[in-house]
């Protein structure tokens, strides 16, 4: 039985997400898989690539052949170089920058708010109306 490591497609119409699976070479693209060994989300920035290195090494050692897209993913993660014994086994996987925690964001916003000058909000239209009303009432009293 010829075994291949290939991608099965998941996700919506314009948002593809793939699973890296081990399956018989004769099965359909989204057909029955022997084992799921990772996932690949190409639309994220940077692309999410999670592959179980230990299982990939096992399947490659027993003769499973990766498809071309999967081989490119294995080269990025460094698993293909490790299997072939090539230099540069670290791969070129880009890692997403860590998001700041909500507590850190809150503390930064609080510190920025404390540094701002404290002054009451001024709405000249409302004050002008009050001043005009006060002036009219004093004029009316003076006229009487």
Curated annotation (Swiss-Prot):
The UniProt keyword set, sorted, is: Ribonucleoprotein, Ribosomal protein
GO CC term (a single one): cytoplasm
Which GO terms of type biological process are on file? translation
**Which residue intervals make up region (Disordered)?**
115-144
Per its UniProt record, what InterPro entries does this chain match?
A: Ribosomal_bS16 (IPR000307), Ribosomal_bS16_CS (IPR020592), Ribosomal_bS16_dom_sf (IPR023803)
Name one matching Pfam family.
Ribosomal_S16
Q: Which GO terms describe its molecular function?
A: structural constituent of ribosome
* Gene3D superfamilies the record matches: 3.30.1320.10
| Family per similarity comment | Belongs to the bacterial ribosomal protein bS16 family.
Q: Which NCBIfam families match?
A: PRK14520.1, S16
Which PANTHER family does the annotation name? 30S RIBOSOMAL PROTEIN S16, SMALL RIBOSOMAL SUBUNIT PROTEIN BS16M
Name-wise, this protein is Small ribosomal subunit protein bS16
Instruction: Please tell me the species this chain comes from.
Output: Nocardia farcinica (strain IFM 10152)
Q: Which gene encodes it?
A: rpsP
């Amino acid at each position: 039985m010829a075994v291949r490591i290939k991608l099965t497609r998941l996700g919506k119409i314009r948002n593809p997400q793939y699973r890296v699976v081990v399956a018989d070479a004769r099965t359909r693209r989204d057909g029955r898989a022997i084992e799921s060994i990772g996932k690949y989300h190409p639309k994220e920035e940077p692309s999410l690539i999670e592959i179980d290195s230990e299982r990939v090494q096992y399947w490659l050692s027993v003769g499973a052949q990766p498809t071309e897209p999967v081989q490119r993913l294995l080269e990025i993660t460094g698993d293909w170089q490790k299997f072939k014994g090539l230099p540069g086994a670290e791969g070129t996987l880009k890692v997403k920058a860590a998001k700041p925690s909500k507590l850190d964001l809150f503390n930064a916003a609080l510190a920025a708010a404390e540094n701002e000058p404290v002054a009451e909000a001024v709405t000249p239209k409302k004050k002008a109306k009050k001043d005009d009303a006060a002036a009219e009432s004093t004029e009316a009293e003076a006229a009487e």
